[in-house]
Amino acid sequence: MAEKEVPLTAVKVEALVVMKIIKHGSQAFPTTATGSIVGMDVDGTLEITNSFPFPVVEVPAESHFDNTAPNPAAAAPRAKANAAYEAEMVRMMREVNVDANNVGWYTSANMGNFINMNVIENQFFYQKEMNERTVALVHDVSRSAQGSLSLRAFRLSPKFMAAFKENKFTSEELQKSNLRYQDILVELPVEIHNSHLITSFIHQLQTPTQATPSDLPPSLAALESSQYAKSSVLAPNFDNLSLSIDPFLEKNCDLLLDSIEVHHTETNNFQYYQRSLAREQAKITAWQNKRKTENASRAALKQPLLPEDEWQRLFKLPQEPSRLDSMLNSRQVEQYARQVDSFVSATTGKMFAVKGNLLPGETAK
């Protein structure tokens, strides 16, 4: 194992592990799939060489339609039963001479909605109990289905680890520690690694070549009607002018609006707390002023003074709600916004190109 003083800079994942994670996530979709990853830390690079899924807990059929039902798969990495199962699997791997150092866990996601309390608690459990240098691999099944593999590695920042350990997420504590929602997760670059045998085999594969015509066409008409002329790379591709919006983009926009509504609700709750606190503080101030006036009168009459700290028993200040949920939701809004930004570039250009035809009275400039 590498020295702890060397910070983690990258994550190298074997291609076989990536395929196992993709298969597990696709089979469990749309529910969450979780599992453990093993490997070793080499000079600041976390090499992940194997993985195995956590046991599946059967869920009653009626709970699939209950939004408030708990998700046992999402909480599986920190379950006591799975911790014993993970230790037994690691022991068996060591018996067959496989890299069996626990380096983290993986989870599947849908539309990038992986920033939630389950992921935070799981990663906190691994970094605190298992190994401080563990990571969480997040595989987005929906994004990967679009043709581009989405596999990212995250760790909790030391600043957030300290705040989560003490469970101090009040406004005062956040201002003191300067903790922002951008500081919750630290992303590490992911590199997919193949063995030398697989790399050599891929380089030996021959690219199929198209057959060339053996005889020249007898006329220009025959040349224009041949399959080689029709398949020319210079032929215009009108599919690029399609104005259909990607369903993935539409769903991301819906999720973004939902997260913004949740953020608005959290803001209203905090403002209600501030108004309640201001009312109670005004009552306390009025009571203290009245008590001081009474004590001044009693002092003039040489009577015993009344206690001025009695307000602590008479009044109860409202407790400030935790800002953790608001921070996680803000980080999720940022995640959705980045995904939307990556998908709108092509569609936005097309919409501006036909703006003059879509809106009457305007001409495209």
From Swiss-Prot:
Species of the source: Aspergillus niger (strain ATCC MYA-4892 / CBS 513.88 / FGSC A1513)
Listed name of the protein: Eukaryotic translation initiation factor 3 subunit H
InterPro entries membership: eIF3h, eIF3h_C, JAMM/MPN+_dom, JAMM_MPN+_peptidase_M67A, MPN
Gene Ontology process terms (BP): formation of cytoplasmic translation initiation complex
Location, primary (coarse class): cytoplasm
Record Gene3D superfamilies: Cytidine Deaminase, domain 2
GO cellular component, one term: eukaryotic 48S preinitiation complex
Transcription in keyword set: no
Subunit structure: Component of the eukaryotic translation initiation factor 3 (eIF-3) complex.
Pfam families: eIF3h_C, JAB
Compartmental location: Cytoplasm
Domain of life: Eukaryota
PROSITE patterns registered for this protein in UniProt: MPN
Family membership noted in the UniProt record: Belongs to the eIF-3 subunit H family.
Domain MPN stretches: 11-160
GO molecular function: metallopeptidase activity; translation initiation factor activity
Primary role: Component of the eukaryotic translation initiation factor 3 (eIF-3) complex, which is involved in protein synthesis of a specialized repertoire of mRNAs and, together with other initiation factors, stimulates binding of mRNA and methionyl-tRNAi to the 40S ribosome. The eIF-3 complex specifically targets and initiates translation of a subset of mRNAs involved in cell proliferation.
Annotated keywords: Cytoplasm, Initiation factor, Protein biosynthesis
